[in-house]
Amino acid sequence: FAPKITVGKAGSGLHIHMMLEKDDKNYIADDVGLTNIAKKLIAGVLGHAQSLTAFGNTIPTSYLRLVPHQEAPTMVCWGDSNRSVLVRVPLGWIAKTNMIKDANPQERGSVPYIPGKQTVELRSPDGSADLYHLMAGIILAAKDGILAEDALEKANKIKNAGIKCSQSIFLNCLLSEIVVLT
């Protein structure tokens, strides 16, 4: 479970998928796409990226994984099909896009769509994570975003508009004051 063992190849992450559910209904996406409450959750998670990274990446080799072109997050923003973002929303799994079939091209039969399974993915943690603090932090960050009045505006502002960091300064960029959503 080492985060990175080979230079030039993707490391091993511990991506955390989150779902908002109440009364057996998933509130991450609806028939149109991502919901406003999901965007607020994302804003909360990104607003607390510093703390979540500290809990999710606890050893020096954790940061060797977080470099460009290694299928790891290198931008503090969110998006749907971009693996370089800190928070990814795999919206392609909703019924109208047929991402399931694209991801499984060898599948001969029809791939059933299972509604209500949409998630939001935090991509930075790895096997070194302090899981108890990380999960508590994610819950509190999500709650903070959902309750914040300006979270929707912040989420819309930072979709695919992250701060791009070189591999040598990703940690500094992530932990700097620039990243804090203001």
Question: How does the language model describe each region?
Answer:
Residues L152, N156-T182:
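Acidic, glycine-enriched catalytic cores built around paired aspartates
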